[in-house]
Amino acid sequence: MGLSTVYSPAGPRLVPAPLGRCRSAQPRRPRRAPLATVRCSVDATKQAQDGVATAVATEAPASRKECFGVFCTTYDLKAEDKTKSWRKLVNVAVSGAAGMISNHLLFKLASGEVFGQDQPIALKLLGSERSFQALEGVAMELEDSLYPLLREVSIGIDPYVVFQDVDWALLIGAKPRGPGMERAALLDINGQIFADQGKALNAVASRNDEVLVVGNPCNTNALICLKNAPNIPAKNFHALTRLDENRAKCQLALKAGVFYDKVSNVTIWGNHSTTQVPDFLNAKIDGRPVKEVIKDTKWLEEEFTLTVQKRGGVLIQKWGRSSAASTAVSIVDAIRSLVTPTPEGDWFSTGVYTTGNPYGIAEDIVFSMPCRSKGDGDYELASDVLMDDFLWERIKKSEAELLAEKKCVAHLTGEGNAFCDLPEDTMLPGEV
């Protein structure tokens, strides 16, 4: 099968598709055409006035070869619920879209669980030449799921095409660490991927694009990506540490004998590695400081931290695979924390750019810190944070690791020659 082909709803065979052209010319590099597009057209004016869509007509596959089955349908927005108000279509790109994490995530995105039940969505799926057939299979499953909010699905292997006009980029795809691979080598290999994707986002994505980096090592990959995308505010880049936060909440709830909805103000400081700092000093259980509820200081300082750090490895030992489903849930949580207002007094953890932070953490790295949002996609760092010597000492250890990683990838961030001196291996279990 050629790479410029699309699935035809008329039958199981593949039909040739003409090469497409991108609106934003990129003379410095050759372009591939989008490999396939699944699109549901919506009239924006009618959308604002009339409400929910009803399928009334389907174009012939020959006239719209980019269509994928039912997504060739045109919706008549005058036909149904007059009180329903659709928001503007949100374009979401997902890299590593044929992987296990994405397999859980994409259906949550399409269902409205993430952005809301009045938010139409377009999914733009980035893969590789090797994963292209799997991407077609993903698109077929999305088609069969009949999500009314899912208006477009496109698949491709060129980030300059897939990232066109995206509002959110969820960068999951990264090379796993192979047997005998040095951590410095993994930083370089994955760093190249995120440098290229940063350049593509810089060239063609929305200027207000929100970027969530999941592929590991995610903090430094996020730094590389933002350094290669100066057209997008550095504040818009995030490294996923929400799964670590969720794991910490679970352990505190178990120890206190409460359900986890009673646990708040949990922070993961630092790197997504075994130097991460689950913060129990500021955490609360049912509105009370954790140290007032859990009086076992030795457990908090030792077992709690180690349990959170090693949770992924234990899961692999039990199940034989890494935590794809819970990672997808944590991505949903991370996005929702930015698009819905933070509950009063609470905060959430996300890896963000440190320049200008109020805590004294080194600038110009991506570091997980406590944040609050008004629900507009923006955030502010929490100011009402307690700090003691025990917490600060561990924060500085994670900071030192990220500064060392930054030196390893200086050639990818425009800061000269790389120098790599990583004295210990702190990759989280399951990521080696």
UniProtKB/Swiss-Prot annotation:
NCBIfam families documented for this protein: Malate-DH_plant, MalateDH-SF1, PRK05442.1
Amino-acid positions noted as binding NAD(+) in the UniProt annotation, renumbered to this chain: 197
UniProt key word Hydrolase: no
BP terms from Gene Ontology: malate metabolic process; NADH metabolic process; oxaloacetate metabolic process; tricarboxylic acid cycle
Activity regulation comment: Chloroplast NADP-MDH is activated upon illumination. In order to be enzymatically active, disulfide bridges on the protein must be reduced by thioredoxin which receives electrons from ferredoxin and the electron transport system of photosynthesis.
Transit peptide stretch: 1-40
Binding residue positions for NADP(+): 96-102, 190, 214-216
InterPro entries: Lactate/malate_DH_C, Lactate/malate_DH_N, Lactate_DH/Glyco_Ohase_4_C, Malate_DH_AS, Malate_DH_NADP-dep_pln, Malate_DH_type2, NAD(P)-bd_dom_sf
SUPFAM superfamilies linked to this entry: LDH C-terminal domain-like, NAD(P)-binding Rossmann-fold domains
Name of the protein described by the UniProt record: Malate dehydrogenase [NADP], chloroplastic
Entry's localization field: Plastid, Chloroplast
Keywords for this protein: Chloroplast, Disulfide bond, NADP, Oxidoreductase, Plastid, Transit peptide
Region feature (Disordered): 18-37
Catalytic activity reported: (S)-malate + NADP(+) = oxaloacetate + NADPH + H(+)
Feature type site, description Activation of NADP-MDH: 67, 72
Active site positions: 272 (proton acceptor)
E.C. number: 1.1.1.82
